[in-house]
C-alpha cells in the first residue's frame, strides 16, 4: 500500500424532485450547476468524505489525504499544501478521470494510462489530437513520456502497486485518490472537491457537488416517505455478487453499495457483515441466505449482452434463486456503461436505478443508466 507524504509543492501554473434521467444528465447537471456558481462559496468544506480534511491557514490550504478504510488507520497520511492553482495532471484510473469530467475540466489531464473501456468523448478527442498522452500501462509506465508531459501531480490508486514507485522517482508528486474507498455514496462524489482545490475551481466543485447532493437526498426522502408505513419487514430484500474462484464475492455490509441499498428502500441480506469493501465468503452460506432474496445485484465486464442464460452457465444453482426466476437480477456491464468513470460521481443515478427496481412507483418515468434487469 502506498504510504508517503507530500509536504509542499508549488505548481508551475503552465497554461494548457426527480423524474427521469438519461446518460446525458451528467452534462445537464454540470451546466445547471455552473449557471449558479455565484451562489456558492470559494471555501471547501468536507461533509461526507472520510479520507479528506481541508484546513485553511495563512500560508495556504492544507489538505490531508488518508485511506477511509478503518483497517487502514496505520497508513501514512499525505499532506498537501495548495498555494496556487495547477492545471496539468496525470490520471491512472477511470474514476480519477470521472472526477475531472463531471467538473468539465478534462483539459487539465495531460496523461492517462489504460485506455480500456474509455467512454469520455472529450478524453478520446484529447488523446487523438495529442493534448493528452498515454503514459503506458501499470507496471510498465513510459517514464520519458510522463516527464515530457510536465504534470504538476500524478493521481494514483492505493489499490494498485505496479510502477508507482518508478513514477515517484521522476520527482513528480503523487496523490493517492481514495474516493473508491469511501463508504457513503456522497463521500465518493465529494472527492471532486479535491480537484476543485488543486485547480482553483472550488466554486465550480461546490456547485456541482451541491447539485449531486440535492438530487441524492431528495430521492432518499421520497423513498422514506413512500416506505415508512410499510415497516422494515415489508421492504424488498437484495443479495449481491456471485461466485469468484472458491467463494461468493459480496459487497460488505458497511460498503457504499450496502448504503445505496438501504437508501433505496431495500434490506441487504448481508447487512450484518462488518466489511466496508468486497469480501469473499463461503458459497453455500451466501447461497442459503440469498436464495429467497427479491433482487440480486451483480456487475462485470462482458462483451455483448449478458443474459440470464449466460449467468446460469456459470453455476446451475443460480437458476434456483428467486431473483433469477422472477427476472429481478440487476446487472451493470462495465463494457457497455461508463460505470468506472462516472458512477462514483453520479451516486444519485445509482440510487435512482435501485429505487426504480425496488419501488418503481416512485420513479415511473425514470430511464435506467447503470443497473438493468437481465433477460
For the regions a protein language model found, what residue spans apply to each?
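Bacterial N-terminal signal peptides
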Residues: 1-7
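Bacterial Sec-exported substrate-binding components of ABC uptake systems
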Residues: 11-97, 204-239, 305, 312, ...
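A short, structured surface patch at a secondary-structure boundary
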Residues: 56-73, 82-147, 153-159
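Stable alpha-helical elements in mature extracytoplasmic
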Residues: 85, 96-99, 105, 142, ...
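Extracytoplasmic substrate-binding proteins
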Residues: 131, 148, 152-247, 271-272, ...
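A ligand-binding cleft/hinge motif common to bilobed small-molecule-binding domains
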Residues: 159-169, 300-312
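Alpha-helical scaffolding within the catalytic cores
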Residues: 214, 218, 280-285, 312-318
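Flexible, glycine-rich surface segments
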Residues: 221-308
Amino acid at each position: 500500500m502506498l504510504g508517503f507524504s507530500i509536504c509542499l509543492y508549488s505548481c508551475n501554473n503552465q497554461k494548457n424532485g426527480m423524474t427521469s434521467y438519461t446518460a446525458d444528465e451528467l452534462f445537464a447537471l454540470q451546466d445547471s450547476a455552473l449557471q449558479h456558481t455565484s451562489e456558492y462559496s470559494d471555501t471547501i468544506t468536507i461533509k461526507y468524505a472520510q479520507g479528506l480534511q481541508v484546513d485553511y491557514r495563512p500560508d495556504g490550504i492544507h489538505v490531508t489525504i488518508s485511506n477511509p478504510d478503518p483497517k487502514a488507520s496505520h497508513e501514512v497520511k499525505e499532506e498537501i499544501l495548495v498555494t496556487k492553482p495547477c492545471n496539468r495532471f496525470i490520471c491512472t484510473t477511470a474514476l480519477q478521470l470521472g472526477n475531472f469530467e463531471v467538473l468539465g475540466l478534462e483539459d487539465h489531464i495531460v496523461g492517462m494510462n489504460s485506455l480500456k473501456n474509455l467512454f469520455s468523448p472529450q478524453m478520446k478527442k484529447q488523446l487523438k489530437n495529442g493534448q493528452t498522452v498515454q503514459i503506458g500501462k501499470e507496471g510498465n509506465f513510459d517514464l520519458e513520456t510522463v516527464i515530457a508531459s510536465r504534470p504538476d501531480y500524478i493521481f494514483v490508486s492505493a489499490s494498485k502497486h505496479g510502477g508507482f514507485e518508478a513514477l515517484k522517482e521522476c520527482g513528480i508528486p503523487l496523490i493517492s485518490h481514495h474516493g473508491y474507498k469511501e463508504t457513503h455514496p456522497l463521500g465518493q462524489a465529494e472527492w471532486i472537491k479535491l480537484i476543485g482545490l488543486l485547480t482553483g475551481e472550488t466554486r465550480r466543485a461546490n456547485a456541482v457537488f451541491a447539485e449531486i447532493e440535492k438530487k441524492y437526498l431528495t430521492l432518499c426522502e421520497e423513498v422514506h416517505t413512500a416506505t415508512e408505513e410499510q415497516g422494515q419487514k415489508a421492504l424488498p430484500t437484495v443479495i449481491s455478487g456471485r461466485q469468484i474462484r472458491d467463494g461468493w464475492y459480496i459487497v460488505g455490509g458497511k460498503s457504499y453499495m450496502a448504503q445505496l441499498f438501504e437508501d433505496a428502500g431495500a434490506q441487504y441480506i448481508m447487512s450484518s457483515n462488518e466489511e466496508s469493501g468486497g469480501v469473499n465468503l463461503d458459497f453455500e452460506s451466501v447461497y442459503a441466505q440469498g436464495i429467497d432474496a427479491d433482487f440480486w445485484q451483480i456487475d462485470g465486464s462482458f462483451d455483448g449482452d449478458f443474459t440470464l442464460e449466460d449467468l446460469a452457465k456459470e453455476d446451475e444453482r443460480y437458476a434456483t434463486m428467486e431473483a433469477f426466476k422472477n427476472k429481478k437480477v440487476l446487472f451493470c456491464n462495465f463494457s457497455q456503461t461508463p460505470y468506472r468513470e462516472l458512477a462514483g460521481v453520479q451516486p444519485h443515478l445509482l440510487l435512482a436505478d435501485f429505487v426504480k427496481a425496488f419501488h418503481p412507483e416512485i420513479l415511473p418515468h425514470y430511464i435506467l443508466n447503470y443497473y438493468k434487469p437481465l433477460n
